[in-house]
C-alpha cells in the first residue's frame, strides 16, 4: 500500500513521474485532496466529464505509473511531444488519454511502445515552469481503449472507445470479498505504521467493488505490468480479486520488512548508544587534560613485539599488512579486536627460540633409569636419537608411538624424555576429539576463533622444539566437523610439517624441530596412513619383579608423602607387597597397585591420627586386615592332571594367564560340544584339532571308531569370561588326545601355538606375557612355536632360568614332552638359546613311545576330586 503521512490525506506513492528521463518526478502528493471526499462532491462533475469525452484524444505516454479512475495525480511534462499533446487538450475540452509505456527507457515512444488500454484524464490545473517544463494536475475519468492512431506527429493522437463500468449486485460473495480486501489493506497499513481512523473510514465508505479496487490499486506499490493488468480488467469483481491477490503478497512482504527493520533498529540503537557513550568519554578525558594516545602506544607496542619475535620474511610481510589495517580502524570496532588478537598471537609464538639439547648420553640414561624401570627398548631408542643429534644437529625429530596397555607409563615416559633432553614438555589429550579445527585451528572469520592445539602448545612452551605428547591417539573420532586423524597427517610427516599452516594464522610454521611422541592402547584403531608415519614401540606389561621394584622406588614413597606420613613410619614386607600385587591387582600397568598402596597408607595415617605410635610394619597377615579379602585368587597348581586336561597360555590386556582346557568323552554319535564362552576363532581351532586327530588317529593311539561312537565335550573354565584367538590350538589338540587315549598330561607343563590340519605349530603373540604367567604359576616347562624363539629376547634372563622353553615346529615334536613318563629334555633355558640338535630325533623316538601296539579305546570319564571354585579370568585373547 501507499504511505499515509497525514490523517487527512490518502496519498499515492508511485515514484518517478510519467514523462521523460532524469529529473522528472511527481509533485508532492500532499497537494492532492482526499479522493473519497472529491469523489463524493464531484461525482456529478465526473459523470458530465465522461459524457463529454470526444472520440479522438491526444495521447500522453507516461513512465512507471498507471492512472486509475478517480485518481488525482500531478505530472511533470518535459518531452516536446507531450507538451504539445497537453496544449492541444487544453484547447479542446481538457481531456487526455494517459497510457503507460511498456519500457521505461524508451525516450520517444511510438504506438507500439505503449499499452493500448489507458485512462482518460481531465486536466484540472497547468503551470509552466522556468525550465520549459509543464506541471499539470490530472484526475482519472474513465477507462478507454485505443481503436486506431490518427496521427503520430507532432504528438500521438488516436480514436478511442471508453470502457463502461458495470455495477455488480452486492451479495454474500461480493460482501466477503470486500471485507477480505479491507482487512488485507488494514494489515498493510498497520505493518507500515500508517493506519489512522480517517484512512480506515475512507476504505469502509466505499462499497462499490470496482471503485474500491481502483482506489486501492492507485495507492499500492506494484510493478507497472501488474497495475496495467488490473486496469485492463473490465469486470469489477475480477479486478477486485486481482487487487486482493496483490494485497496478500504485500502483507507477506511487509511482514518480513517490518521484522528486518525492527532487528536493524535494535542494532542501530545499540551502536548509537555505544558511540554516544564513547564520545562522552572522550569529552570527559579532554576536559581532564588526558590526551587519548593509547591507540598509538598500542600500535608501537605491537610493532616492537613483532620486531622482537624474529619471524620469517613472508610472515612479517603479512603481519605488517595487518598492522596497517589496524592503524586505519576505529579502536573499539569488532574487526580491530580480531586483528589485534591475531597480531598478538604472531608476536608471542616462538619463531626462533630453541631449547638447547642436553646431549650428555650418560646423564640422559641415568634420568631414564631413575624415572622408569625396564622399558629398555624405548630407552635405547631415545639414546639413539640423542646420539644422532649429537653427531648431526640438523637432524629431524623422530615421531614415536608408544603402544601398550593402560598404566604402563606411556605418558610419563614422555615427560622423562623431555627432562633427559632438557626440553620443554607439552601434552595434548586427543581422546574423544572429533573436530579437525582442534588441530588446525578455526579461520578468523568465525567469532571466537583460535589457533589449533598444536600452535597453542608451542606458545605455552615458549620454544620451537618442545617434546609434545599426543596422548590417546587411537581414540580420535570423526564426524561432520572433520577428521582430526587426517589433520595429524601433516603434523606428523617430517617431509611436510616444516610448512605447517594453521587455519587461524594462515602463515607457515616450522614443526620439524618438535619431538612428537604418541601414545595408544590399540594400534588397530589408528588409521593406516597415520600409523605409517609413526615409529611404533610396544610397551609390554610389567613383570612381578618390575612392579615390586617400581612400588619400592616410586609408588610407596609417593603415597607415604601424600598421606602425611614419613618413610620411617611405614614398612612393607616383600611378601606383603607381592601379595598385594598378586591378589589385589590384575593388570599390565600400575594404576590399581598405586590405589591399593594409597589405601594402605590412608589406613595407617588414620591409626597415627588416632594416637597410635609407629612405625607400622605391614606383613602378609596385615594385608587382608587393611585391604579386605583378596580380589583375585591364583588357581591352585594341580599336582596331577586328569585325562582330558591340559594347560594353555592366554594373553589379556592385564598380562598373561594360564588357561585350563578340559575335554571329556561320552557315548554318542561323534558330536563336538564347545563351552566356556569361546569365540569363533577358538571354536575353529577346536574343529581343526579334532580333524587333525581323526586324520592320524591310529598314530596317536586313538581308536578311529570314536568318530561314530562317542561325543566329545570341550570346556574352558571361567565360563563368564569371553575367550578367543588361535593360540589355544595345541592345547585343545593335547586335551582331546588325552581324553581319547586316557594318557595324563604333565601338570608342570603349559603350551601355546596355533595348530594346522597338517599338525604344524604356527607362531602367536604375547610370548613374554605368557611365559611370565607360566613362571608365576610355578610351572617348569613351556612349549612355544619355533618361530617365536626370537621373542625370548624380551623375556628377562632371570625368568628363563626358572622355566624350560621347548620350541617346536610340528605337533609330533610335542608328543614326547606333554604326557607323563616321557622325556622333557632338549628345551631352551638360561639365556634362551635353542637346545641340542637332537631335538628332532628325540621327538621321533618319543613318537614311537606314544604310539600304542594297538589303538586304545577312548578312556572312560575319570572320577576326579571336587575342584576349588576357579576365579574368573579377564578377557583372554589367546591369539594376540
From Swiss-Prot:
User: Does the record bear Hydrolase in its keywords?
Assistant: yes
Biased composition of type Low complexity is found at 852-861
Instruction: Locate the compositionally biased regions of type Gly residues.
Output: 826-836
Q: Where mainly located?
A: cytoplasm
Which InterPro entries does the record match to this protein? AAA+_ATPase, ATPase_AAA_core, Lon_bac, Lon_bac/euk-typ, Lon_lid, Lon_proteolytic, Lon_Prtase, Lon_prtase_N
Return the Gene3D superfamilies for the record: 1.10.8.60, 1.20.5.5270, 1.20.58.1480, 3.30.230.10, LON domain-like, P-loop containing nucleotide triphosphate hydrolases
Q: What induces it?
A: By heat shock.
Q: Where in the cell is it found?
A: Cytoplasm
Q: Where is this region: Disordered?
A: 1-37, 826-880
- Give a GO biological-process term: cellular response to heat
Q: Which PROSITE patterns match?
A: LON_N (PS51787), LON_PROTEOLYTIC (PS51786), LON_SER (PS01046)
Instruction: Provide this UniProt record's keywords sorted from A to Z.
Output: ATP-binding, Cytoplasm, Hydrolase, Nucleotide-binding, Protease, Serine protease, Stress response
- SUPFAM superfamilies attached here? P-loop containing nucleoside triphosphate hydrolases, PUA domain-like, Ribosomal protein S5 domain 2-like
Q: What class of enzyme is it?
A: hydrolase
What Gene Ontology cellular component terms go with this record?
cytoplasm
Recorded E.C. number(s)? 3.4.21.53
What residue spans carry the Basic and acidic residues bias annotation? 27-37
Give me the reactions it catalyses. Answer: Hydrolysis of proteins in presence of ATP
Q: Known PANTHER family for this protein?
A: ATP DEPENDENT LON PROTEASE FAMILY MEMBER (PTHR10046)
The record's HAMAP family line, in alphabetical order, gives:
lon_bact (MF_01973)
- Say what the protein does: ATP-dependent serine protease that mediates the selective degradation of mutant and abnormal proteins as well as certain short-lived regulatory proteins. Required for cellular homeostasis and for survival from DNA damage and developmental changes induced by stress. Degrades polypeptides processively to yield small peptide fragments that are 5 to 10 amino acids long. Binds to DNA in a double-stranded, site-specific manner.
Please give the name of this protein.
Lon protease
Supply the source organism's classification: Bacteria, Pseudomonadati, Thermodesulfobacteriota, Desulfovibrionia, Desulfovibrionales
Amino acid at each position: 500500500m501507499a504511505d499515509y503521512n497525514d490523517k487527512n490525506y490518502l496519498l499515492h506513492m508511485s515514484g518517478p513521474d510519467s514523462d521523460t528521463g532524469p529529473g522528472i518526478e511527481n509533485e508532492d502528493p500532499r497537494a492532492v485532496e482526499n479522493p473519497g471526499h472529491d469523489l463524493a462532491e464531484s461525482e456529478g462533475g465526473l459523470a458530465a466529464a465522461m459524457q463529454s469525452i470526444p472520440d479522438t484524444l491526444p495521447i500522453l505516454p507516461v513512465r512507471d505509473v498507471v492512472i486509475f479512475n478517480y485518481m488525482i495525480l500531478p505530472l511533470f511534462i518535459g518531452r516536446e511531444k507531450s507538451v504539445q499533446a497537453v496544449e492541444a487538450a487544453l484547447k479542446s475540452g481538457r481531456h487526455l488519454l494517459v497510457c503507460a509505456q511498456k519500457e521505461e527507457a524508451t525516450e520517444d515512444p511510438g504506438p507500439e511502445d505503449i499499452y493500448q488500454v489507458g485512462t482518460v484524464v481531465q486536466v484540472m490545473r497547468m503551470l509552466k515552469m522556468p525550465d520549459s517544463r509543464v506541471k499539470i494536475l490530472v484526475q482519472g475519468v474513465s477507462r478507454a481503449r485505443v481503436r486506431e492512431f490518427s496521427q503520430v506527429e507532432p504528438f500521438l493522437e488516436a480514436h478511442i472507445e471508453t470502457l463502461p463500468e458495470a455495477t455488480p449486485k452486492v451479495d454474500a460473495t461480493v460482501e466477503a470479498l470486500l471485507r477480505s480486501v479491507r482487512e488485507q489493506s488494514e494489515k498493510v497499513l498497520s505493518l507500515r505504521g500508517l493506519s489512522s481512523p480517517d484512512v480506515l473510514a475512507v476504505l469502509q465508505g466505499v462499497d462499490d467493488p470496482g471503485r474500491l479496487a481502483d482506489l486501492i490499486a492507485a495507492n499500492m506499490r506494484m510493478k507497472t505490468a501488474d497495475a496495467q493488468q488490473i486496469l485492463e480488467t473490465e469486470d469489477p469483481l475480477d479486478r477486485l480479486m486481482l487487487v486482493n491477490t496483490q494485497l496478500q503478497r504485500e502483507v507477506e512482504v511487509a511482514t518480513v520488512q517490518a521484522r528486518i527493520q525492527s532487528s536493524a533498529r535494535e542494532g542501530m540503537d545499540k551502536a548509537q548508544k555505544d558511540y554516544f557513550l564513547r564520545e562522552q568519554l572522550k569529552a570527559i578525558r579532554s576536559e581532564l587534560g588526558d590526551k587519548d594516545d593509547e591507540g598509538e602506544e598500542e600500535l608501537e607496542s605491537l610493532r616492537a613485539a613483532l620486531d622482537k619475535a624474529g619471524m620469517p620474511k613472508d610472515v612479517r610481510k603479512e603481519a605488517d599488512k595487518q598492522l596497517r589495517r589496524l592503524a586505519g580502524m576505529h579502536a573499539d570496532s569488532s574487526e580491530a579486536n580480531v586483528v589485534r588478537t591475531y597480531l598478538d598471537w604472531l608476536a608471542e609464538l616462538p619463531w626462533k627460540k630453541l631449547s638447547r639439547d642436553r646431549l650428555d648420553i650418560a646423564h640422559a640414561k641415568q634420568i631414564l633409569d631413575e624415572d622408569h624401570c625396564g622399558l629398555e627398548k624405548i630407552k635405547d631408542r631415545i639414546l639413539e636419537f640423542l646420539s644422532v643429534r649429537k653427531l648431526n644437529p640438523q637432524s629431524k625429530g623422530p615421531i614415536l608411538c608408544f603402544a601398550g596397555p593402560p598404566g604402563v607409563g606411556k605418558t610419563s615416559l614422555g615427560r622423562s624424555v623431555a627432562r633427559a633432553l632438557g626440553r620443554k614438555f607439552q601434552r595434548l589429550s586427543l581422546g574423544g576429539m572429533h573436530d579437525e579445527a582442534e588441530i588446525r585451528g578455526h579461520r578468523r572469520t568465525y567469532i571466537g576463533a583460535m589457533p589449533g592445539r598444536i600452535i597453542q602448545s608451542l606458545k605455552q612452551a615458549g620454544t620451537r622444539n618442545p617434546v609434545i605428547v599426543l596422548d590417546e591417539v587411537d581414540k580420535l573420532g570423526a564426524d561432520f566437523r572433520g577428521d582430526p586423524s587426517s589433520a595429524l597427517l601433516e603434523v606428523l610427516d617430517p617431509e611436510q610439517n616444516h610448512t605447517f599452516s594453521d587455519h587461524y594464522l594462515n602463515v607457515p610454521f616450522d614443526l620439524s624441530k618438535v619431538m612428537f611422541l604418541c601414545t595408544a592402547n590399540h594400534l588397530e584403531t589408528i588409521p593406516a596412513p597415520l600409523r605409517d608415519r609413526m615409529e611404533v614401540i610396544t610397551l609390554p606389561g610389567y613383570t612381578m619383579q618390575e612392579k615390586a621394584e617400581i612400588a619400592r622406588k616410586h609408588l610407596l614413597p609417593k603415597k607415604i608423602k601424600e598421606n602425611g606420613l614419613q618413610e620411617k613410619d611405614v614398612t612393607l614386607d616383600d611378601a606383603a607387597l607381592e601379595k598385594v600385587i598378586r591378589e589385589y591387582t590384575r593388570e599390565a600397568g600400575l594404576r590399581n597397585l598405586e590405589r591399593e598402596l594409597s589405601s594402605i597408607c590412608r589406613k595407617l595415617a588414620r591409626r597415627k591420627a588416632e594416637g597410635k605410635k609407629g612405625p607400622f610394619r605391614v606383613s602378609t597377615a596385615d594385608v587382608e586386615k587393611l585391604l579386605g579379602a583378596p580380589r583375585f585368587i591364583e588357581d591352585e597348581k594341580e599336582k596331577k592332571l586328569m585325562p582330558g586336561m591340559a594347560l594353555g597360555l592366554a594373553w589379556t590386556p592385564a598380562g598373561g594367564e594360564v588357561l585350563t582346557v578340559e575335554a571329556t568323552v561320552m557315548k554318542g554319535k561323534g558330536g563336538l560340544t564347545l563351552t566356556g564362552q569361546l569365540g569363533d576363532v577358538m571354536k575353529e581351532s577346536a574343529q581343526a584339532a579334532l580333524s587333525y586327530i581323526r586324520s592320524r588317529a591310529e598314530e596317536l593311539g586313538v581308536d578311529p571308531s570314536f568318530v561314530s561312537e562317542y561325543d566329545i565335550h570341550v570346556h574352558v573354565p571361567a565360563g563368564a569370561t569371553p575367550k578367543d584367538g588361535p593360540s589355544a590350538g595345541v592345547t585343545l589338540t593335547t586335551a582331546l588326545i588325552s581324553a581319547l587315549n586316557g594318557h595324563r598330561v604333565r601338570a608342570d607343563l603349559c603350551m601355546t601355538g596355533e595348530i594346522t590340519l597338517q599338525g604344524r605349530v604356527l607362531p602367536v603373540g604375547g610370548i613374554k606375557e605368557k611365559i611370565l604367567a607360566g613362571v608365576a604359576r610355578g610351572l617348569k616347562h613351556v612349549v612355544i612355536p619355533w618361530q617365536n624363539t626370537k621373542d625370548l629376547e624380551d623375556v628377562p634372563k632371570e625368568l628363563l632360568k626358572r622355566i624350560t622353553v621347548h620350541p617346536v615346529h610340528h605337533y609330533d615334536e610335542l608328543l614326547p614332552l606333554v604326557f607323563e613318563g616321557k622325556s622333557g629334555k632338549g628345551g631352551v633355558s638360561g639365556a634362551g638359546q635353542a637346545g641340542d640338535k637332537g631335538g628332532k630325533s628325540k621327538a621321533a623316538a618319543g613318537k614311537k613311545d606314544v604310539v600304542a601296539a594297538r589303538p586304545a579305546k577312548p578312556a572312560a570319564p575319570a572320577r576326579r576330586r571336587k575342584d576349588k571354585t576357579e576365579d574368573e579370568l579377564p578377557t583372554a585373547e589367546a591369539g594376540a
